[in-house]
Amino acid sequence: HGAEERELFLVSALGVISGMLPNYTGNYFGSNVGTNLYCFVVGAYGTGKGALKWARQLGEITHLNRLDEAKEEEARHKRDKVQYNMQLALYNKGKLAEPPTEPAQPRHLKLFIPANTTKTAVMQLLEENDGNGIIFETEGDTLADMLRQDYGNFSDVLRKAFHHEPISFFRRSNNEDVDVPRPALSVILSGTYDQLLKLIPSIDNGLYSRFCFYILEGNDTFRNPFDKDDFNHGHYLAQSAEEFKQLYLALSYREDDMKFFLNERQQQRFVSHFAHLKEWTQSTISEEMDGSVNRMAVMCYRIAMILSILRYYRLH
């Protein structure tokens, strides 16, 4: 379709892919950073934001694969539970010297984490999925409404996860403290400007500088929805989704991280560009935007990581 729709797909696809690259890190200020991005597409009603659904398809096969793994864990847990109850009965009758160990609860494995959920549920899903997850929501106020609720306000989780800072919570069902040492969360949202303001009311909000935004202008002409030459998105994306699943699994099985590096020339260009941008922002807009430029640099570095591993994967 048009250039704007292709750009929209590119932005949202980068967001989805950024959440599908586990065990892949780069060194940034001495810390290991992953590829995770927060993206928000802003546009009026009916301007074509629905194209985001194609980007979500890139992770759909991986998501379904995770759900199948969860079903297998649940079936295994049921079998182990039967065995545990039998051994417990024998122990209670004095026929076993040691009490049996109760099997751990099955994990809720998935790639996509629902936005309309509680803070504790989000942290639990991250913990059960090795800290990884993607929040993908085409109506931005779904997340905004949850963040306004006391039980659903996980804004602090989003802010910490952007930098992979540890998060912790108390699991009442097992009466235990749970830590997620390195959350790696990606977020892809779309909505109108009013919906954006519900989520991020001002630049002072900590989420503002963590998101990359794409402004969708829309198209004045009415497109023919019956065009027979229209591209078969479904077939192409199904093939791509399978490739991304294979890449996701290959990285998941690694015992150590795959590393990303910039060479000396690239490092110099990177530092020079953002130093100039920071000076320009301070003199032209406001010194209060310093943090936004710093995080913009992190996003740029992460996009470079994504593009590099995709090229590497295709070549190898």
Where in this protein do the model-derived segments appear?
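Phosphate-handling catalytic cores of nucleic-acid transaction enzymes
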Residues: 1-316
